[in-house]
């Protein structure tokens, strides 16, 4: 025990070296590599921050992007000469009704039709001329070009399709697909509808005025027939009066001539009686002639009346039966037009115009208020 305690005591008595005198620990190779990597990362971050700061600073003007213009394509379209290919049908300008409708349309209203026919909008001066020269599409039905035209027409609104139908003298009733088929079928082989030329409103109004004037003249003629007969009777009375006056003057002259010879023979008295009888017979003959003349005139007037009645009987029944449309008929036409029309686009003026076109023989301007009220009732 004493031997073990002795070294321990020796150890306790030995001096402890100070901490500052310890040797510095040398870093290993791994620690050096990690420090180098950290330094590199710090340098990279600093470089990135500097680049960001540089990018924020605007130096000079920004480079503009060059605009690519399709000048070559436009010039190629302009250089292509305009040619009208001959179709299978008749030229639109040679069809009377279509020529009439074309003359009434403005050039701006024909742009879409021109584009449909020739794949170009056309100029204002040549729109009507080019549309009139069209005689049908050169391609067949069901081809790719036909389908392209069909797709082009389907993009049009109903109002535009109906205006095209109006120019081409086609029915304007139906759905979009029906109108498209109708227009394409006609444009493949244009031909006249066979209907007569529509009368303009001015001519129809003049015609109605003439009809009114003619009816007024017939009434006047009927009224003037009676005065003519009366004038004949009065003329016969005047003739009788004149004859009486002449006979009285003749008697006075004869009496004056007979006065100087006071003595008259029986023969002279008989002669006087005979002359008086002859004068009476002349008077009766004059009266009969006047009566016969009046009867002849009456017969002539009755013949004229019968001839006018016969001529009116010879007229066709359609002329006699033609009457302006009733309120119910106008209401039905307005119903049909509203059913086919697009209420968001159609105006009251267009509906009134279409109603007038359904009845071109009559002037319906006086019944415009009734048409408007019916439209409002049907819409509400």
Swiss-Prot record:
Localization annotation: Nucleus
Domain SAP: 153-187
Comp. bias intervals (Basic and acidic residues): 20-31, 52-67
Domain DEK-C: 324-380
Database matches in SMART domains: SAP
Sites bearing ADP-ribosylserine, chain numbering: 284
GO BP: chromatin remodeling; positive regulation of transcription by RNA polymerase I; positive regulation of transcription by RNA polymerase II; positive regulation of transcription by RNA polymerase III; regulation of double-strand break repair; regulation of double-strand break repair via nonhomologous end joining
DNA-binding region(s), chain positions: 342-356, 372-376
Modified residues (Phosphoserine): 20, 33, 55, 76, 125-126, 163, 205, 208, 214, 231, 234-236, 247-248, 255, 292-293, 301, 306, 308, 311-312
Keyword terms of this UniProt record: ADP-ribosylation, Chromatin regulator, DNA-binding, Nucleus, Phosphoprotein
GO molecular function, one term: histone binding
Ranges for region Disordered: 1-67, 188-330
Mod. after translation: Phosphorylated by CK2. Phosphorylation fluctuates during the cell cycle with a moderate peak during G(1) phase, and weakens the binding of DEK to DNA.
Motif, Nuclear localization signal: chain positions: 209-225
UniProt feature, compositional bias: Low complexity: 283-296
Biased composition, class Basic residues, residue ranges: 198-207, 263-282
Record-listed Phosphothreonine modification sites: 294-295
GO cellular component terms, A-Z: B-WICH complex; contractile muscle fiber; nucleolus; nucleoplasm; nucleus
Biased composition (Acidic residues): 32-51, 247-258
Quaternary context: Found in a mRNA splicing-dependent exon junction complex (EJC) with DEK, RBM8A, RNPS1, SRRM1 and ALYREF/THOC4. Interacts with histones H2A, H2B, H3, H4, acetylated histone H4, non-phosphorylated DAXX and HDAC2. Component of the B-WICH complex, at least composed of SMARCA5/SNF2H, BAZ1B/WSTF, SF3B1, DEK, MYO1C, ERCC6, MYBBP1A and DDX21. Binds DNA.
Task of the protein: Involved in chromatin organization.
Designated name of the protein: Protein DEK
Species this chain originates from: Mus musculus (Mouse)
